[in-house]
Amino acid sequence: MDPSLPAIVAEIVVDLPESRALSADGTTTWSRADRPFAALGPDGIEIRLDRDIAAAAARTPDTAQSSRGPEWIRFNPGDLDDHALDRLRAWLELAYRRALD
């Protein structure tokens, strides 16, 4: 995992006003309206997307299906280049918006 991932995630999530963080057992989980949309742990960040988007996202570099279910991906970049940062921001913002659906 890129060592800057936690700081980058924090920078993105701070702009999501209704998100709440809960840390336990080495994992920080963010939710909106009590619905989790992202979880950051030692193996990267897991993000809840629409099922079809998650399936497509899992085919991108450094991304795989999450054990949390078919709507979740695990993103564990070795290097946060511009493309990885773009995907991370887009996925987190989408997950945040979709948490109310």
Model-predicted segments: where are they?
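Charge-dense, helix-prone N-terminal extensions
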Residues: 1-101
